[in-house]
């Protein structure tokens, strides 16, 4: 809720459990009896929290670790300034995709600026306060780009160690956002994982 064209309910307070519930509600509404959940960054925390028995697999792409992701208090005013300064979110998104940006990158910046006002600081606070409530027991693929300025390799290793059936795939020369930097590689990785969990 509150991203892209999805409205946020009045009084919405960002939290990982609230986002996870919204994802589960969506899957039920579209009649998806089984799903492979793919989560990037904050979405990795959401997918981790949303995974349940009917989940066939989990792919975590430079995801926030199950122990949460603290943001230093001094950074919160900077996050709040993104609401007024168009260049600030653009610079932040550029840092998250250091090797390549798609032609539609300006549209991504526009979309980011339409985010619900509660999200600017709220998402960082949600990640700081979140701890995974349980470890999903099915197959998990943890993807980590070595140029990520936000998620460290140690965090990615801790994420993989948290799940009983996880493996870590390290991607050299990729930053935080493989989905932007090399979507073809991500597609191939996802197709391979889908074949594994379908077999």
Q: In which residue ranges do the predicted regions lie?
A:
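Alpha/beta-hydrolase active-site loop signature
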Residues: 1-4, 65, 175-178
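Active-site loop/oxyanion-hole signature of alpha/beta-hydrolase fold enzymes
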Residues: 2-38, 188
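Conserved catalytic-core motifs of eukaryotic protein kinase domains, centered on the activation segment
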Residues: 6-12, 70-72, 153-154
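Catalytic nucleophile loop
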Residues: 39, 43-44
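Flexible "cap/lid" loop of the alpha/beta hydrolase fold
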Residues: 45-85
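Conserved alpha/beta-hydrolase catalytic His-Asp/Glu region
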Residues: 69-74, 83-135
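Conserved serine/cysteine hydrolase catalytic core
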Residues: 121-161, 170
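Catalytic active-site module of serine/aspartate enzymes centered on a nucleophile-bearing elbow/loop
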Residues: 166-199
